[in-house]
Regions:
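PLP-dependent amino-acid enzyme catalytic core
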Residues: 1-126
Length: 126
């Protein structure tokens, strides 16, 4: 299990959503698996379609109360935060697997899911 750097609260408090995502995802995704620059590009692409520049802005509504807005993604659902990145991960690994393949050798990916409500619309982004 990864551990946070000693001064993470101070060092990461000023980061943008995408920069914070890069730091957090890097704890779980080895640079041997996805080089840091590739991971940064995946994160930036995943959240570039969000309607708010902060992706998921945090608003203070009371002395100790905050609201995190998770509806600024392409389908207005909180699930966009995870599924936009997941779709780009699928594409990244598929492109890597197909790098030197042609024609019938090339692999494809089919995602089959059953859902209701807002999840289905989010998953269509794949």
């Amino acid at each position: 299990m990864p551990t946070l750097p000693e001064n993470w609260q101070h060092d990461w408090s000023h980061l943008s959503f995408t920069d914070l995502a890069l730091e957090l995802y890097s704890l779980f995704i080895s640079s041997d698996e996805i080089p840091r620059e590739d991971l940064k590009e995946l994160i930036e692409r995943s959240y570039s379609t969000f309607r708010h520049p902060e992706v998921a802005p945090l608003h203070r509504v009371g002395e100790k109360q905050w609201i995190l807005e998770l509806f600024h993604g392409p389908t207005f659902a909180f699930k966009d935060v995870a599924l936009q990145f997941l779709g780009n991960l699928f594409e990244y690994f598929l492109k890597r697997r197909n790098a030197n393949k042609v024609g019938a050798e090339r692999e494809s990916l089919t995602v089959v899911g059953a859902t209701s409500g807002d999840t289905g619309r989010c998953a269509l982004g794949f």
